């Protein structure tokens, strides 16, 4: 896969305020990999909290920061782990929070992963719209891209980040399949996420099902 991400300093950024949810909401469903019945609850959080995930099923209800440094696995889902606290399949929820403009949120889950729901981010987006957002007093922090950044992993996946006058993400992906050709898509406005990206659903090739089951994954993948 190859991703190209571009962003620059937007006029007015320096006066933007952090935002959190106006209220809490919960979503229920099976975990994609564990098959467990799970509940995840998104709550308002104070300024400068960021995204924090609390395992309320564990002793002491420990909290893990949803940051890149805590990503330990990306096989069929994003896993965060630190000091024995582990939570997986967070990617749809995290994407929805960011795209909808939520800066601070405490997320409580009663198991080792978020529920898969319908395999997309739509339900997260709908709930965020339903409860709404509230401005906070602290200014929003921004990363400003001033020069090209490029990262390639051992599998050949590549991310290129470029300065630009507008926000955009372009993704290209090859599935090595005679049934699905290489895919190409562009998101040129983050506000289009709810309509153009959120409905995209997780899928799997038949050829991959047995290896995934043997890896003790997709126990809840009966959508």
Each PLM stretch: what is its role?
Residues 5-103, 108-223:
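C-terminal regulatory domains involved in ligand/effector binding and gene-expression control
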């Amino acid at each position: 896969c190859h991703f190209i991400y571009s962003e620059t300093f937007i006029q007015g950024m320096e006066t933007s305020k952090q935002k959190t949810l106006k209220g809490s909401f919960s979503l229920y469903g099976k975990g994609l990999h564990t098959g467990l019945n799970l509940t995840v609850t998104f709550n308002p959080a104070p300024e400068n909290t960021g995204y924090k995930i609390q395992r309320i099923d564990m002793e002491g209800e420990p909290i893990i920061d949803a940051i890149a440094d805590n990503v330990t696995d990306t096989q069929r889902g994003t896993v965060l782990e630190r000091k024995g606290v582990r939570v997986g399949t967070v990617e749809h929820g995290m994407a929805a929070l960011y795209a909808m403009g939520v800066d601070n949120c405490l997320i409580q889950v009663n198991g080792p992963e978020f529920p898969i729901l319908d395999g997309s981010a739509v339900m997260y987006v709908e709930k965020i719209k339903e409860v709404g957002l509230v401005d906070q007093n602290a200014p929003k922090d921004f990363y400003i891209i001033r020069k090209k950044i490029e990262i390639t992993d051992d599998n050949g996946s590549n991310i290129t980040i470029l300065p630009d006058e507008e926000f955009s993400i372009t993704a290209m992906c090859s599935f090595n399949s005679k049934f699905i050709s290489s895919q190409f898509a562009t998101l040129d406005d983050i506000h289009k996420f709810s309509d153009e990206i959120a409905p995209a659903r997780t899928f799997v090739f038949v050829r991959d099902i047995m290896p995934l089951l043997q890896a003790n994954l997709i126990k809840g993948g009966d959508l």
